Amino acid sequence: MYRRLGVEVALLQRSPLLLPDWEPEISLEARGVLEEEGVHVAMGVQVKEVRKGGDGGGNVVVTNLGEVEGDEILVVTGRRPNVDLNLTAAGVELNERGGIRVDEELRTSNPDIYAVGDVLGGRILEALAEKQGSITAENTLSNSHRKVDMLSVPRSVFIQPNAAGVGLTEAEASKLYYIKSRVLRMEDVAKAKILGETRGLVKMIVDSGNWRIFGVHLIGENGAEVVNEAALALRLRTTVYDLVDTVHVFPTMAESLKLVAQSFFRDVRNMSCCVD
C-alpha cells in the first residue's frame, strides 16, 4: 500500500523465503509480485543494530548484508501467547510453541479449563479463534465433544494479488501419504485474462490413490475469496473428481480450482472453456 502511494519500501526477511511456511512456489511468486511493485526485498537478513541517522534524521538498520536507511521502521517479530498467569498452579501445561496445550476438544491438561485463540500459540487467525470459542462453548455447556477441523482452516496474505491457502503443503503431505501435485498458472484462467491480472498460480496436492484433496495453495486476483471453496472441499473430504464434476460459473477466478483439478488428467492450457 505504501509503495503504491509513492513511498520507497524495503522488506528485510530473516528467512531465505518470503513466506517460509507456505509452498515455495507461492513464496517466490509473492516476492516477484512485491518486486514488480517496486518493493526492495532482501532474504536471509540478520539485523545487527538499529540506530538514528546523522543529525538525528531517519533511522539506519545495520544488517549482515549492509545498511538500510529509512524514515520509519516497522519491526514484525510475531506474537507470543500471553501465558504469564502462573498457569502451572492450576495444572495447565504449555506446548512446544510456548502456548497452552489443549486436546482436540480444546481442553487443557486441567480437564475443567479450556483455552482458545492466540493463546494456544498456533495460527493467529480471527476466524479460527471465533470458531474455537463457539465449539468450546458447546463442549462445556452440552458436552458435545466437537473438534476443530484444522485441515480445512484457510489463511490469506492480503498482498495484491492475494496469497491464500488451505490444508497440507506438498512437503507436509508427502510425509504422510503417497501424493501427486499440479500447478496451474493464472494466465491460463479466462477471468484472470479478462481482469488483466494474470500474475499468480494455484497448486493442488492430492492422494495418488483415491484422489482426495489434501491442500490447495494459490496467489491470484481475489485469492482470499477463492480459497473458501477449497476450504469446503477439504472440510467435506472431496476428491479431484468432485471438483471436476461441479459446474463452475464462467468466467470466474474460482474456475481456477476446477482447472487445476482437470490438469491431473489433461493439458488445460489450450482447452476450450467449460470442457469437462
Predicted segment positions?
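Rossmann-like dinucleotide-binding cores of NAD(P)H-dependent redox enzymes
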Residues: 1-55, 124-130, 138-172
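Short acidic-glycine loop/turn motifs at beta-strand connectors
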Residues: 53-54, 96, 208-210
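Conserved beta-strand-loop-beta-strand element in the redox core of flavoprotein oxidoreductases
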Residues: 51-67, 73
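FAD-site-proximal beta/loop scaffold in flavoenzymes
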Residues: 68-142
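Residues forming the flavin
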Residues: 2-3, 8-20, 59, 68-69, ...
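A short alpha-helix-loop-beta-strand transition element characteristic
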Residues: 93-95, 143-154, 177-182
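Flexible, glycine-rich terminal cap/loop adjacent to redox cofactors
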Residues: 158-276
